[in-house]
Amino acid sequence: YSGLMILTGGPGTGKTTTINAMIHYFEAEGLDIFLAAPTGRAAKRMTEATGCEACTIHRLLELTGNVDDSSANVHFERNADNPLDADVIIIDEMSMVDIHLMHALLSAIVPGTRLILVGDQNQLPSVGPGSVLRDLIRSECFPIVCLTHIFRQASQSDIVVNAHKIHNGEEVIL
C-alpha cells in the first residue's frame, strides 16, 4: 500500500502534537480526514487531544455482528465493495491493532487514500494475533517517522527517564 506512513515514538515525544499539525495541514488542503483508534478510550483521548471527532476502528468500519474471541461472527459494512470515503485516515494507538482488524481496515481503503499509523511499538500489544505496528516498522517498506526527543513536561520524571533508558539499553537511575 503506497499511501501508508508510520509515526512512532515513546511517551511524550510529540506524536499527538504531530497529529494535530497534520490535521491542520490536511484541513487547509480541503481534504476529508477520519480519525480512529482501536479502543473507545483511545478514541476519546484522540478526540480530546485534537478537538476533532475520533471513533473506534470498529465503528469507522461499521461493525455488525458479535465481537468475541474469533472473527467468525464479525462483519464490517465498510469493505472493498463499500469503501471508506476519506482522503486521509489517521489511526492512533496502532500497537493495539491485530492482524484481523488491520486486514479489515486495508480492505476498506481505496487507492489514493493516505493512511497514517501512529503509535509506540513498545506499548500495549494487541490482544489478538499479530504485532502489526512492530512488523510494519521492521519491514522498512514504508516511510517511518520516529520521534525520539521527550518534550512532555514530565520528561524529567524518573519513570519517564528510566523507561527511555531501558528502551535504549542504558543503565537506569535508582
Protein language model features and the residues they cover:
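Conserved ATP-binding/catalytic motifs of P-loop helicase motor domains
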Residues: 1-174
